[in-house]
Every structure is written in structure tokens, then in C-alpha cells.
A protein has these predicted regions:
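Alpha-helical transmembrane segments and membrane-interface helix-loop junctions
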Residues: 1-179
Length: 179
């Protein structure tokens, strides 16, 4: 189990770095958006490339932020009975949710997003907008993000099994959201 826990903590470290990149992308997207608005409405200058950079950065925000959100246990969850369960019950729900829903869904998404990226990369697909950018960098964010969410899911499953077997101590405090 110790080798698996080392793997899980290594994945956590990578996810944290991805989260930092996502946070930086949010700032860059906001600055570029403000700059685009100023140039467009203040100086009557527009650039499709700069507009498209914004959605590239949005892809980074979402796809690189997702594994970090999962690591921090801050993801959206449908709380019907979760908050009423014991700590052990919540850990079991998390573990089963990861194994039965998260990992299979990420597998399907990886299966379909990888060929999409490869096709865009091989053909050099460009934006249809004048002055637009190549599309494969944004498409690459999909399989990369799904892969990282998958790895983070495996990490979370390992840590929960570790908690259940008393070989890993984790904070399982759950704060029910305001309703």
C-alpha cells in the first residue's frame, strides 16, 4: 500500500501544479478580455486571434482546474444523503462513486477526445475566422484534462482505501452546503 500511496501523493502534487496553471490562466483570460474590450470599444481595433486566445485559456482553466478541484474535494456533488452518513459511509460513497462513475466516464471521454485532438493536429485545423489560430492546442486540453482527472480519481480511490484500512490518515470532514 505504501507504493500506491506514494503514487497517489505524486499525482496530488501534479494536480496542484495543474491547479496553479489554471489559476494563472484565469488571470490571463481576464486581462486579455479587458484588453480586447478596451481595444475594441476604445480604439476600434479587433483581433480574432486575441479573442480565440480567451477560449484557449478557458479550456486550460476548466480542464487543468478539474483535477485540483477533485483533489481538494471541492467538486460539485449531489447531496441527498451524503451529509447524514458516518465518516466511513461517506468514504465508501466517495470510493464507489469514483470507481463506478468517475473513472468509467473519464475513460469514455478520453476515448473520444484523443482522436479529435489527433485529427486536428494532423490536419493542422485552423479557425475559420480571419486571423484565427490553429485549433489543436485547445483540443489537446480535453484528453490531457480527462487523463489528469482520471489519475486524480485513482489517487482519491487509493487514499480512501488507505483510510478504510487505517494506513492513510486524511481529512474527511464534510461541510454541508447552505441550502
Amino acid at each position: 500500500m505504501s507504493a500506491l500511496l506514494k503514487f497517489a501523493l505524486g499525482v496530488d502534487w501534479i494536480s496542484e501544479r495543474f491547479g496553479r496553471i489554471a489559476a494563472t490562466a484565469v488571470l490571463l483570460a481576464a486581462l486579455i478580455s479587458a484588453g480586447n474590450a478596451f481595444l475594441r470599444y476604445g480604439l476600434d481595433i479587433s483581433s480574432n486571434a486575441w479573442l480565440e486566445i480567451q477560449w484557449y485559456l478557458f479550456a486550460v482553466c476548466v480542464m487543468f482546474g478539474a483535477p485540483e478541484v477533485l483533489r481538494l474535494n471541492e467538486h460539485v456533488r449531489v447531496d441527498i444523503f451524503y451529509g447524514k452518513l458516518s465518516s466511513k459511509g461517506r468514504v465508501w460513497v466517495d470510493l464507489l462513486g469514483i470507481l463506478l462513475f468517475l473513472l468509467p466516464a473519464m475513460g469514455v471521454l478520453l476515448y473520444y477526445s484523443w482522436p479529435l485532438f489527433l485529427n486536428m493536429y494532423r490536419t493542422g485545423e485552423m479557425s475559420s475566422n480571419a486571423g484565427g489560430l490553429i485549433r489543436w492546442p485547445a483540443a489537446l486540453m480535453l484528453p490531457l484534462g480527462f487523463l489528469m482527472v482520471s489519475l486524480q480519481g485513482v489517487s482519491e480511490a487509493i487514499k480512501r482505501v488507505g483510510w478504510l484500512t487505517h494506513t492513510y490518515d486524511m481529512d474527511i470532514h464534510y461541510e454541508r452546503p447552505l441550502q
